[in-house]
Structure formats: C-alpha cells, structure tokens
C-alpha cells in the first residue's frame, strides 16, 4: 500500500513530539521538547498557536474541563482554559504564569537533577501515564508513572532508559509501551489501573532505527514511529508487521490519528542531531486517510 504525505505544519522543531488530537477543539496539539513549546494546529482554519514553557516539556494533553496537563522537567502541571495561548510554567517556586485564564499550577512536582519528562498518554480512566528519562539516556534512569486526577502518583516502572510510546487497545484490556533503547514494543495486561504480564509484541531489527511514539487504531493495530528509521510501521494485535510507511525524514518521533473522522495520521519529526540537511525535519506531516483512529480520552484532573 502506498501512502501520500502532506506537510500539515511547516516548522523547524528541534524535537517535535507528542501529537494528540483534541476532539473538543478539533485541533492537533503537539510539542517541541527541546524548544520548550506547546503548539496547536487547526487543520480547517489553518490557525496555529504556540505557548512557551520555561522547562523542557515532554507531553501536553487536553483536560476534561478545558486547558492542558503538561509533563514537564520537574513534574506534572496544569494550565487552565486558555493556557495554550498565554502563561508560562514556573521554573522556580510552586506556580508561575499569568493571572486569569491560563493560570499554571503544579499537580505533582519532583525535581531530579539530570532527568526530564518525556512522552505521556491519558488512559481510559482519565489518568496520565507520564514517562521520564535522563538527559544522558542512562539505562535505569527513567520511570513510567500513573498520575491520578487528584495528583496521586504511583511509579509503575522504575528501570527505564527512554520512556516513550504508551497506548491502549480498543477494549482497554491491553497497554502497549516502548522503552526505546530496547528496540521492543511491549504489551501488558491492563485492568483499568494496574499492569501485569509484560511481554514482547514486536521488535525493531538493528539498522531500522528505534521505536519511539505509538498510537493504536480502531482495529487494535499499533502504529509506531521509528527514530532513525525514517518510517512508521503498523503491527497487528498479534505482532505481525502489517504496513510500512516510508517518510522523507530520518527521525519521525510519534504519530496520532486526527481530523473530524479520525482518519488522518499526523506525524511529528525532529531536527536535533542530524548531520545532513533534511528540509522537512522538524515539521508535522499528515497522511490523509491512513486508517481509523480511536477517540482519545482527556485528563480528568
């Protein structure tokens, strides 16, 4: 099957990541981790917004009541409605940003020198599963934690190098997860809050890059962006490689379905670390009609 890509957002993000379709606002949310920016894009009007954060941001997801939950270097924070267009996260103290709509507050703060936030995802129950990693990507330096809407944090995995893609099967009974240096896409049994029975769904062959972000479609298949692999792959629920989407960039980072009918696959990309010019690296690509995605829950806090 041949896929035709389009450039959704021409950009020069250092480390574009975390595409998320905000169904309530009918827009795409994505981030530049190293640029400390949260971006939004309305594909109908073409309107784009950008919000600067004062810390590296690993993920930004919509909240049920409006605003955003953000996975930041020093913890998880909340922006009120309008927060995507005004206000900054505080780099010191317990709060920051402007007054009024868009106010920022910490939901959970934990300063660990040398560590930063990475990918995150909202589970079917509205909790945030937030990953971390060390800047030097040291094995065992990262974590995956469940952050409840009230701010209660439970560390689920504490022996992680680069915590990355996380997603759930259509029935919510399986959780997929990537720790990128392992080259594996793993699957867990999921009971609504806890995971168990970790096993390998698939592995990326040496020379084909590293698995990064993922999304699960309505058929239960797992789409995985391959960092340094220049492609997105689709795996069936039994781990069979089903499709390969070649891309004009070496470092796709993550993917998510969006659009009114959730059939357009948005793909974020990175420029950081490249030694040769790749004009579209750092932009957001889209493949119209690539498949059928699942509605993504908003954070319940």
Where would I find each of the regions flagged by the language model?
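A short loop-to-beta-strand structural motif that recurs across blades of beta-propeller domains
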Residues: 37-39, 75-77, 142-145, 184-186, ...
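Hydrophobic alpha-helical segments and helix pairs
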Residues: 102-158
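Loop/turn-rich, solvent-exposed surfaces of beta-rich toroidal or solenoidal domains
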Residues: 183-184, 203-237
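Short loop/turn segments that connect beta-strands within beta-propeller blades
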Residues: 42-46, 80-84, 147-151, 189-193, ...
């Amino acid at each position: 099957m041949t896929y035709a890509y389009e450039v959704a957002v021409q950009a020069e993000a250092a480390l574009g990541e975390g595409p998320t379709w905000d169904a309530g606002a009918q827009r795409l949310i994505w981030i530049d981790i190293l640029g400390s920016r949260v971006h939004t894009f309305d594909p109908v009007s073409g309107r784009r917004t950008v919000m600067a954060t004062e810390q590296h941001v690993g993920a930004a997801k919509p909240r049920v009541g409006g605003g955003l939950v953000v996975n930041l270097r020093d913890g998880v924070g909340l922006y009120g409605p309008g927060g995507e267009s005004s206000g900054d996260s505080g780099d010191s103290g317990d709060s920051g940003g402007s007054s009024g709509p868009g106010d920022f507050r910490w939901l959970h703060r934990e300063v660990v020198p040398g560590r930063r936030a990475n990918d995150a995802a909202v589970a079917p129950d509205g909790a945030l599963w937030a990953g971390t990693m060390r800047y030097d990507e040291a094995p065992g330096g990262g974590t995956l934690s469940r952050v409840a809407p009230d701010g209660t944090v439970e560390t689920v995995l504490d022996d992680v190098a680069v915590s990355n893609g996380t997603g759930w099967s259509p029935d919510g009974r399986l959780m997929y997860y990537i720790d990128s240096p392992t080259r594996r896409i793993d699957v867990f049994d999921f009971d609504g809050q806890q995971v168990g029975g970790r096993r390998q769904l698939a592995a990326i062959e040496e020379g084909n890059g590293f698995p990064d972000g993922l999304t699960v479609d309505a058929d239960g298949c797992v789409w995985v962006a391959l960092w340094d692999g220049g492609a997105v792959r689709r795996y069936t629920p039994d781990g069979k490689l089903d499709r390969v989407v070649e891309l004009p960039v070496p470092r796709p980072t993550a993917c998510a379905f969006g659009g009114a009918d959730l059939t357009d696959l948005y793909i974020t990309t990175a420029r950081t670390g490249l030694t040769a010019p790749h004009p579209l690296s750092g932009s957001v690509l889209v493949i119209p009609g690539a498949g059928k995605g699942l509605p993504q829950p908003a954070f319940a806090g």
